[in-house]
């Protein structure tokens, strides 16, 4: 975390290692987006969204189950008008709150985020940003500047590394330092269902240049730039080889906008529904989740990798990974 808390760390160990329960509720808070990024599949599937009272009940269940972190994300949380009430309810239950956004509505809604602890904004480049996201970087910068002065912890900019933005990475890191915000990196994940033309356009083709870029990220981290990733993780990113035991589906309870529960961002087939009760779904699917993790070829989503390494008490990650 950006601010290490021995108490929260102890609660996390108790919840995950002793009780064998998740520590984080990752909630797809809506099914709509105000961007149309070619490499993303989420915005293409608008569907049913839980009513506010159902979300409150979900949060109540989660807290009763021992979950201490609420993460609101996907498709674009700031499109959900009741977001402030949802965050407030989570905070009143004693949960740490976090939010992932594309930032387009951040300037407009930043004042409403008084109950938010951690904010992550997707910033995938400087010169390449418009080509990647379809809007100009200038559209989101005022919101980032405004929000960083409202939330309690350092704001995070997350960059997905692709073939489009390799020339922007060092500038982006320097920009993060100048703005007094944190920055994280992860490689692009090739979701099924996205056109091959998109991957041909966005994918990493020049591996030598890619590795030089990641080497520079590692160097700049060691030089003290505000990069939250661990070196252990960044070395995996450099080789695009996930060398870890995944515990994402033990750490995180993943709930969709319609209330269905899925294994993780990669294995998205529903394994239950909150109407069953999350405790029942968790216990019933224990073997299924274990089998899925064992058979998975693994991804490099930084939240999954870093937290799985933390779960296994990796010392370097514990020392140098700085986020939820």
Could you say what each language-model-derived stretch is?
Residues 8-16, 21, 243, 258-324:
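Flexible mid-to-C-terminal extensions adjoining Fe-S/redox cofactors in radical SAM and related proteins
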Residues 1-112, 118, 312, 320-324:
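Conserved alpha-helical substructure of the radical SAM core
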Residues 39, 43-46, 252, 270, ...:
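Secreted/processed peptides and extracellular or luminal domains of membrane proteins
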Residues 43, 73, 122, 186, ...:
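Conserved residues at the C-terminal ends of beta-strands
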Residues 28, 50, 93-96, 111, ...:
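Radical SAM enzyme [4Fe-4S]-AdoMet core and its adjacent flexible, acidic
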Residues 34, 38-41, 247, 297-300:
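Cys/His/Pro-rich metal-binding microdomains
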Residues 36, 66-67, 115, 151, ...:
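Short loop/turn motifs at secondary-structure junctions
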Residues 27, 31-34, 240, 290-293:
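Processing junctions and N-termini across compartments
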